[in-house]
Amino acid sequence: MHNEQVQGLVSHDGMTGTQAVDDMSRGFAFTSKLDAIVAWGRKNSLWPMPYGTACCGIEFMSVMGPKYDLARFGAEVARFSPRQADLLVVAGTITEKMAPVIVRIYQQMLEPKYVLSMGACASSGGFYRAYHVLQGVDKVIPVDVYIPGCPPTPEAVMDGIMALQRMIATNQPRPWKDNWKSPYEQA
């Protein structure tokens, strides 16, 4: 090895090794603060897209109304285009014929995207044990938060959204999303 290369390991641009590490760590601190600011912005500006097929969709409408005011948690206006939304709220029964449609909607959403399964029908098929009903939307798309109930109360929906916001704020890893392959995905 050349003498300059060996010397470059010890010092950088005429600084001692500790000075170089201090200067480099300042850049990392800035990056971590920037990540925290981005997470704060994502947490407080969720744009939900409701996919309501049953009574849970009616409950979601009441949560979006003035009595419960979901806007104070950052979910201001429901979006009806997947390209403008980052939170897919699946509220109601999902049948086998609906599955390719919901997968396509999920694929059209921009990253980062989140899925909230609202109610017993979306989470586990509900009381329908028929051949045409999916036993949970997590069979076709990855779900971040499950909200129990038939239908869930507006307070439970708000708790589910706040749980999702806590997950976003802490940058929790989502391994179920990274390795997900849906049986309905198009190549």
From Swiss-Prot:
Pfam family membership, one: Oxidored_q6
Enzyme class: translocase
Cofactor note: Binds 1 [4Fe-4S] cluster.
Gene Ontology molecular functions: 4 iron, 4 sulfur cluster binding; iron ion binding; NADH dehydrogenase (ubiquinone) activity; NADH:ubiquinone reductase (non-electrogenic) activity; quinone binding
Biological process annotations from GO: aerobic respiration; electron transport coupled proton transport
Known role: NDH-1 shuttles electrons from NADH, via FMN and iron-sulfur (Fe-S) centers, to quinones in the respiratory chain. The immediate electron acceptor for the enzyme in this species is believed to be ubiquinone. Couples the redox reaction to proton translocation (for every two electrons transferred, four hydrogen ions are translocated across the cytoplasmic membrane), and thus conserves the redox energy in a proton gradient.
HAMAP family reported for this sequence: NDH1_NuoB
NCBIfam families the record matches: nuoB_fam, PRK06411.1
Official protein name in the record: NADH-quinone oxidoreductase subunit B
Species of provenance: Bdellovibrio bacteriovorus (strain ATCC 15356 / DSM 50701 / NCIMB 9529 / HD100)
